[in-house]
């Protein structure tokens, strides 16, 4: 899938991302990576909710690409043949046929629940990514904050909130401690696998959301 570049992840975009996740500010008129003229231009048609979510996901994907670039440049993890060893120790969310997000057997309600649940499950892994980058610290934070905003938008779209599973805080805390206690090689590999899996999950989510 070709990601469309939307905006550079600079300090301004990062600060905007932080503002958007404040409860008092939600829903905000402008999403990260979104120009205010896209929302309220006097002589143009404002973006629909679906279009804004689409653009927001592509913004996050751009951030993931920047983080993966740094990861690949500083290590050989992107080419490693030992990925399976580390991947077996992770429980990263993935799309399956039963989730109703694929073209065959598509089910909007079931799929939306899966997307939201998956994003909630990814949050602990996005927390792990914080402080894992030297030159892209703001990008890592922006991806994390923008994902929180995306979850809030999708929850407003969902009809069956009771079906959404939220990870237990104690479970997440235990997992985070375990991941941070790994040796350097495994931490680098975990970072690579999280970014790759999150990219794949968002791409699948984007394709599914375009059918809704």
Swiss-Prot record:
Disulfide bonds join 72-78, 101-111. PROSITE patterns: INTERLEUKIN_6. Residues 1-27 form the signal peptide. Its main location: secreted. GO terms for molecular function: cytokine activity; growth factor activity; interleukin-6 receptor binding. It is found in: Secreted. One of its GO terms (biological process) is positive regulation of multicellular organismal process. It comes from the Eukaryota. It holds the Pfam family IL6. The keyword Plastid does not apply. Transmembrane segments: none annotated. The modification Phosphoserine is found at residue 81. Glycans are attached at residues 73, 172. Keywords: Acute phase, Cytokine, Disulfide bond, Glycoprotein, Growth factor, Phosphoprotein, Secreted, Signal. GO terms for cellular component: extracellular space; interleukin-6 receptor complex. Component of a hexamer of two molecules each of IL6, IL6R and IL6ST; first binds to IL6R to associate with the signaling subunit IL6ST. Interacts with IL6R (via the N-terminal ectodomain); this interaction may be affected by IL6R-binding with SORL1, hence decreasing IL6 cis signaling. Interacts with SORL1 (via the N-terminal ectodomain); this interaction leads to IL6 internalization and lysosomal degradation. May form a trimeric complex with the soluble SORL1 ectodomain and soluble IL6R receptor; this interaction might stabilize circulating IL6, hence promoting IL6 trans signaling. Belongs to the IL-6 superfamily. Cytokine with a wide variety of biological functions in immunity, tissue regeneration, and metabolism. Binds to IL6R, then the complex associates to the signaling subunit IL6ST/gp130 to trigger the intracellular IL6-signaling pathway. The interaction with the membrane-bound IL6R and IL6ST stimulates 'classic signaling', whereas the binding of IL6 and soluble IL6R to IL6ST stimulates 'trans-signaling'. Alternatively, 'cluster signaling' occurs when membrane-bound IL6:IL6R complexes on transmitter cells activate IL6ST receptors on neighboring receiver cells. This is Interleukin-6. It comes from Macaca fascicularis (Crab-eating macaque). The gene is IL6.
